[in-house]
Amino acid sequence: MKTNRQINRIRGLMDKYLEIVHSDRNKQNLKMWKEVGSWNRDKPRGFVPLKPNGHLPYVIELDISLWRKLTNDTNLVEYYSDPYTHMEFQLQRSLNHHQLYKDNFVFTDELYIWFGVITELSLFGSEVVWQEHKEGWIKEPILSSLEQVEKLTPPDFYKSGLMPKIHEFYQVMNEVADGKLKVLFPELARGPFCMAVHLRGISDLFCDVLVNPEGVHKLMRFIVDSEIEWTKERTRFTGEEPTRLKLFNDEIDCPSIGPQIYNDLIFPYEEELAKISGGVRYWHSCGNISAFLPKINKLPNLEVCHVGPWTSYEEADAIFGSKTALEICLHPVNDIVMADTGQMRSKLEDIINKCPHENYSVRADALMPQGDDLESQLSKIKEWEEIAREYFG
């Protein structure tokens, strides 16, 4: 049980944060995006960019492993286990972001509950290992063979995996927020293929794709049906309709898989979920998805597609045009931390020259601690921002 002093400290941070939310600078940043809807996890993204002042938006996002170093080395085990620390850290993180960077990040009057990319996997029985310095991860895959899919049971909205902790956080954070900030209940964001990879194990699943595709279809079917039912229960619990679909799929990468595998084993399930959800708000893979772009372009009402460092933004611009916005993410080491001024400038100019539809934002993301020289790394990020502000924002 936390003391009144600790709760008052959190509420003091809330007051400072709300000043940022209602600031003129934040209002100006809102104009840089077509719509800023609720984002039920960390790292808000998936927004369609606008160009109100002749410049497209850019965003800087440090990884949580780096943010913790800027908040007195917060122990992330505590952050993921204690709702008060969860609130305090994310508020302090936002205050630090506003102070450090002049990017087009938008602050909203909302708080999230987010335990990392393993959240959904825990619902299916994967055991989580927590770590002090970075996001938690899972132990071994729970499926030693595809025959075990028949024995899986759909996640219980209240009891499975991290759900009891999510409900605890939701209750406590709402009590502390006291109506000043809206606490968002999590939504499912991992794509079905991502889930399948980690429930079965990446090497085994890729072998299954070749020798037992029907078994893979059964696993995908189970995951999709489970996600649909979980989302229905979320609607009953919160009284809120789900937002448009988010599909995080870092495991979709070429040449790990080819276009035919995506077309046959993955796309049909993404399309099914998209039709139920009224479209796809955001499709994400950090892998090389250039070969999949023509098929991804056929997903209904796709608003934003992530274009990571290994995907051709030139091809993405040509394929999506003005229909779907691109979120172009730079390589955090090659394009920022280890880049010199000329390389930073050249990269941004290359994006501008090769994306004539001007339907994109630029994101410096996944910035993690690099060695012991933290000040030097932060200085390089600031240097990149100064250059980025000449072209964007």
Residue ranges and their predicted role:
Residues 88-112:
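Catalytic domains of carbohydrate-active enzymes, especially glycoside hydrolases
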Residues 72-86:
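Surface-exposed strand-loop-strand hairpins of Gram-negative outer-membrane beta-barrel proteins
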Residues 142-151:
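Residues forming anionic-ligand binding surfaces in small-molecule and nucleic-acid pockets
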Residues 1-76, 104-112, 117, 127-138, ...:
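Active-site loop segments of alpha/beta catalytic cores
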